[in-house]
């Protein structure tokens, strides 16, 4: 992926995350639940003082430091490995985008706005940035696993 496309994609993904959070705050009261796709997905405005899926509540400085380290390392890795395959680039793009999206909330609000509730499973309420992080990490693990299978 070319550097310009990567940066543009990063900006668009972070903007989508921030716009989704802005929309939730302006249309749904704190704690209110609104069906989005009945029986599948509801929207619920929550203020999360923890990490992804509400773990480690009230540890903001810990998350700021970890986020800066992870994003910094991902950018360093991209810069020093210019010939990564598209899947690793996509994984790192999602990880960086998700990290930045939640980092903006932590710095601006001292909490992260969560809103997506899966009605069909007992699971934590999460946000778009959490989704980026989850998919990015899963994709990166698959890439690394495949490399190991092929002896790279």
From Swiss-Prot:
Top EC category: hydrolase
Pathway: Protein modification; lipoprotein biosynthesis (signal peptide cleavage)
Example of a GO biological process term: proteolysis
Annotated keywords: Aspartyl protease, Cell membrane, Hydrolase, Membrane, Protease, Transmembrane, Transmembrane helix
Reactions catalysed, as given in the entry: Release of signal peptides from bacterial membrane prolipoproteins. Hydrolyzes -Xaa-Yaa-Zaa-|-(S,diacylglyceryl)Cys-, in which Xaa is hydrophobic (preferably Leu), and Yaa (Ala or Ser) and Zaa (Gly or Ala) have small, neutral side chains
Topological type in the membrane: Multi-pass membrane protein
TM ranges: 5-25, 61-81, 84-104, 125-145
Enzyme Commission number(s) of this protein: 3.4.23.36
GO annotations of cellular component type: plasma membrane
Transmembrane recorded as keyword: yes
Subcellular location per the Swiss-Prot or TrEMBL entry: Cell membrane
Stated role: This protein specifically catalyzes the removal of signal peptides from prolipoproteins.
UniProt family annotation: Belongs to the peptidase A8 family.
Record-given protein name: Lipoprotein signal peptidase
Organism: Streptococcus pyogenes serotype M3 (strain ATCC BAA-595 / MGAS315)
